[in-house]
Amino acid sequence: MEEKEQVDLNQLLNAIKSLTLQEIKIFTDKLQDELGISSDNLYSSRGILTESTSHNKEVEEIDEKTEFDIILEEVPSSSRITVIKVIRSITNSGLKEAKEFIEALPKTVKEGISKEEAESVKAQLEESGAKVTLR
């Protein structure tokens, strides 16, 4: 910044400092109108969170989740055989392990998998009749 610009800014600062609070309020309102800036934008750009912006931040954090766990909640008796087959293919386990797996529910089928894989596994289990949740 050139020396002349620095002097002009210092003069502007001194002029603003000499204003009363009421004059500063009027000045900032006019400045916001002139520049098309709202006070909401000022607060969020400074990192001051209002209730609505903090809520939006929480929603974004939830949306950013990248790893999911598949929890097998319930298997109806009429769907046991089909669910056992799906569990065997998903977990690469034997018949005995898959059968024991569905007897002690709820149980985690897969942990830390991508959203796409989680949705695929969930769809397979639900198609076979199981009740599944994603976490």
Swiss-Prot record:
One annotated Gene Ontology cellular component of this protein: ribosome
Keyword terms: Chloroplast, Plastid, Ribonucleoprotein, Ribosomal protein
Protein's cellular compartments: Plastid, Chloroplast
Keyword Plastid tagged: yes
Molecular functions (GO terms): mRNA binding; structural constituent of ribosome
One BP term from GO: translation
Highest taxon, organism lineage: Eukaryota
Pfam families the UniProt entry points to: Ribosomal_L12
Signal peptide feature range: none
Main location: plastid
Function: Forms part of the ribosomal stalk which helps the ribosome interact with GTP-bound translation factors. Is thus essential for accurate translation.
Family: Belongs to the bacterial ribosomal protein bL12 family.
NCBIfam families, A to Z: L12 (TIGR00855)
Complex formation: Homodimer. Part of the ribosomal stalk of the 50S ribosomal subunit. Forms a multimeric L10(L12)X complex, where L10 forms an elongated spine to which 2 to 4 L12 dimers bind in a sequential fashion. Binds GTP-bound translation factors.
Protein name, as recorded: Large ribosomal subunit protein bL12c
Lineage of origin: Eukaryota, Viridiplantae, Streptophyta, Charophyceae, Charales
Chain's gene name: rpl12
